[in-house]
Amino acid sequence: MLRASATRFLSQAKNMNNSPRLFSSASAALQKFRAERDTFGDLQVPADRYWGAQTQRSLQNFDIGGPTERMPEPLIRAFGVLKKAAATVNMTYGLDPKVGEAIQKAADEVIDGSLIDHFPLVVWQTGSGTQTKMNVNEVISNRAIELLGGELGSKAPVHPNDHVNMSQSSNDTFPTAMHVAAVVEIHGRLIPALTTLRDALQAKSAEFEHIIKIGRTHLQDATPLTLGQEFSGYTQQLTYGIARVQGTLERLYNLAQGGTAVGTGLNTRKGFDAKVAEAIASITGLPFKTAPNKFEALAAHDALVEAHGALNTVACSLMKIANDIRYLGSGPRCGLGELSLPENEPGSSIMPGKVNPTQCEAMTMVCAQVMGNNTAISVAGSNGQFELNVFKPVMIKNLIQSIRLISDASISFTKNCVVGIEANEKKISSIMNESLMLVTALNPHIGYDKAAKCAKKAHKEGTTLKEAALSLGYLTSEEFDQWVRPEDMISAKD
């Protein structure tokens, strides 16, 4: 009985993601189709979809991962920007304005996301992204045909290759769309999110500037600092992280468009590359420009590797910050307990009253994912052979995912954790006053060796540092009180 149930469950689990591939609410038996043709022949395509034969063929040939593995939406929107820009420029080179304007209108619908359901292809396809590029061409072609009152699938008066793809190749359009998508996401999502978190940490640094606590190195007691100083370190990490990300943009602004197949610009007109870059800059409001060397722009994606390297560094920073905060908030009674973190939800199904540092845990998992993505992008970026890198889809998938994860996690961490952090001043003071590392203040007065004897004696006998120092006869009570003052140990002396 159990075996039969398990078999049935496994069968259902295997098939559960197949039905969305129809992309229609109608049952398979009732769904209507139309004929579309590519160079391999005719194929039946769902009648309510704008894609054509090449997209349908890709759905059949690359049924890998299911709907969750589709090309990221920012890339599709970036393709809309590119196709609109190309149509604008191509009209100056002889493209029929009626056709060009219809392409622009259809591209606008790709840009605003209203056609996103017509882009079903997964990342796992040809490494140049040709299937997705043709998905874009077919959708824009059919939508433009519809706008002009024509018949879907007729390829007239708007042809997916001759008109939508005029003067373009997969090899230059896909890297162009990758750069546009990355830059738009960095500007519109990542930098604002990191800035919000940085500013919240900076506010906490100012709030905690008067609270003196014990420092820790090697997970052992060290000399004092203020809680504000500790948080200032986190603030500076993110300030540098934002600057690192911004520093990669100059290379991401360079666009491959105009290189066509191998970087030579075959089948384009002189000036096409620069004009398309100008049009993309106009549409997005961002300073895109044509790449100075199209051979590099097609064969290598070092700019994307560099950009994700900056994200990886940010992830390392966020991992350290989130871990520090949750360790400082450990307890509430048997941990460090120096910080009180916001209580957002119950923490345990078996331990009543338990509350966990969930925002810190979510952030550290995001960082782990980003670090993994960095490995994938590094491998992909190192594998461009001759005139073309053919790991493009996996690179942009991971880059866009990392940007989105870091951005969302930073906003969540700020709103649900950082702004609500409180200092447990009583616990902080208690821990600091028990620390033997305050003995460091005695170094200039009695020397390192004698100070070390004081610390070891206090630790061995379980006494206070002052009691040990007095029993050894190295100083008087008044001298100890004068020299061992935590508030005098948090900065350099004049």
Curated annotation (Swiss-Prot):
EC number(s) given by UniProt: 4.2.1.2
GO CC annotation: mitochondrial matrix; mitochondrion; nucleus
Keyword list, A-Z: Cytoplasm, DNA damage, DNA repair, Lyase, Mitochondrion, Nucleus, Transit peptide, Tricarboxylic acid cycle
Function recorded in the entry: Catalyzes the reversible stereospecific interconversion of fumarate to L-malate. In mitochondrion, catalyzes the hydration of fumarate to L-malate in the tricarboxylic acid (TCA) cycle to facilitate a transition step in the production of energy in the form of NADH. In cytoplasm and nucleus, involved in DNA repair in response to DNA damage: following DNA double-strand breaks (DSBs), translocates from the cytosol to the nucleus and promotes DNA repair by catalyzing the dehydration of L-malate to fumarate.
Subunit comment: Homotetramer.
NCBIfam families in the cross-refs: fumC_II (TIGR00979), PRK12273.1 (NF008909)
Pathway: Carbohydrate metabolism; tricarboxylic acid cycle; (S)-malate from fumarate: step 1/1
Pfam families linked: FumaraseC_C (PF10415), Lyase_1 (PF00206)
Note: There are 2 substrate-binding sites: the catalytic A site, and the non-catalytic B site that may play a role in the transfer of substrate or product between the active site and the solvent. Alternatively, the B site may bind allosteric effectors.
Major localisation: mitochondrion
Protein name: Fumarate hydratase, mitochondrial
Reaction(s) catalysed by this chain's protein: (S)-malate = fumarate + H2O
InterPro entries: Fum_hydII, Fumarase/histidase_N, Fumarase_C_C, Fumarate_lyase_CS, Fumarate_lyase_fam, Fumarate_lyase_N, L-Aspartase-like
Transit sequence range: 1-15
Organism of origin: Rhizopus oryzae (Mucormycosis agent)
Entry's family note: Belongs to the class-II fumarase/aspartase family. Fumarase subfamily.
